Amino acid sequence: MNDTHVSVQQASKAFKEVGALRCVDASFERGKIHGIIGRNGSGKTVLLKCICGFMRLSSGRILIDGQPVKPAAPQNIGVIIETPGFIGSLSGYQNLSYLASLKGVIGKEDIERVLQCVGLDPAMKKAVRKYSLGMRQRLGIAQAIMERPPLLVFDEPMNGLDNRGVEDMRALFHSLREEGKTILLASHNPLDIDGLCDTVCEMDAGVLRRV
């Protein structure tokens, strides 16, 4: 039985009469990895921002677990949509610890666990300003998964990663799927999603179609 986690219904978004999303309809099943492929400027990021409630649709609606997404309302979603921003003078561990303290939901062992999951445990005490782009991306993924949200939304998650890093993240995403997480993964590079995703859609000029 299909268990829809995210439903996009006739979603449109325009900026000064330019259509970024054009009547998008899509259903994303729970516990699957869903790839969205498309060139830069095709509308992928706009769609993900609307799903997360960061941006308001011009028309249509988006449902998560059957409930309409409300812009600016708290969502139980792990997100990487733009280059993660961290405090450069603090270590990777300290950055996650600070973010966790704002919500008071996870402890020391949980932070160490997610850093290990993304392969940053050897560098957890290193200042983030000394991190490479790939290491910052790993830290962003650690931040996204540390509260164990059921839905993960990743825009270009392989950005800055070397071949080893890409393979590590692919393995991590598979393990997250085994835990029942739903993952929406957007990329301009078909190689990022090849063999990784359960479903693949292509976004072109604001139009989404199943591949």
Each model region followed by its residue ranges:
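The feature captures the beta-strand-to-loop junction immediately N-terminal to the Walker
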Residues: 37-39
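Helix-to-loop junction immediately C-terminal to a conserved catalytic motif
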Residues: 52
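Conserved ABC transporter NBD signature motif
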Residues: 60-73
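Conserved ABC ATPase "signature" region
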Residues: 97, 106-123
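Catalytic Walker B motif of ABC-type/P-loop ATPase nucleotide-binding domains
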Residues: 152-156
